[in-house]
Amino acid sequence: MYKRQIITNAHKIIQGEHPDLSRKDSDCFFFQRLQEKDATQLMLDLVKTRLPNAYGYSPMEDIQVITPSRKGSMGVIELNQQLQAVLNPKSVDKPECRSILYTFREGDKVMQIKNNYDIIWHKDGENGTGIFNGDIGYLRAINRQGQEVIAEFDGRRATYPFEQLDQLELAYAVTVHKSQGSEFQAVVMPLLGGFPKLYYRNLLYTAVTRARRLLILIGSQNVIYQMVDNNRRMNRYTCLRDMLEQQKPTQTLPISQSDEPDGEIKDTQKQEESL
């Protein structure tokens, strides 16, 4: 019987237990790939061909690659360029424009990376303002003569002059941080050795819970287990609280009720045969 292992593994992770990566009857896959080139190639094959063929998912709309970091060979900048090359390849029929980081072309999947409260959008004869940090959409047109692009976010079309292209990034791959608050039918996450400070339990939990129907982890099982074991964020706040306790003055001073402190710091599968 098909098992909802995403939910089970999410509970395990947040409780500090290692997730079950071996089930063959679940919605959570793990592929061991210890070389970056092998992990990247599998990711590209899954997003472009294997998941669409097996589940009918749209590579653009349903599948999201999520990764811990921006930089490095497994970071969003590099992965976006590779995913763009296979999902929206260069063509004489597709106009392009350039930002500092990326070459954009018509049809690209993009993300707004800073709040823009003033930009005007149009949808079904209605007008409004505001495209916000984390919104994901698509480039519908690039007007090189007019030096502007049209991006569509959930039916809202907004025009960006070229000088505002720094507000957009390719979004075939996004960081875990940028994925917060969103859900996707399928999540593909490469996890190999990278930046140790970024590999911790809450980050893995956040990534896993972005997946509605299907989660695929690619890389090293040891890295995944190390993330679960690394409760760095919780420890950071615990250490801060202990440090503040130690620095409390020994002399008791009279204070008014309005001056009282709040008192507590709060921290707001190996299944390749079926794919």
Indicate residue ranges for each PLM-predicted region:
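Conserved helicase motor core of P-loop NTPases
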Residues: K3-G130
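Intrinsically disordered, low-complexity sequence elements enriched in Ser/Thr/Gly/Pro
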Residues: Y2, F31, N230-M234
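C-terminal accessory regions
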Residues: N133-L275
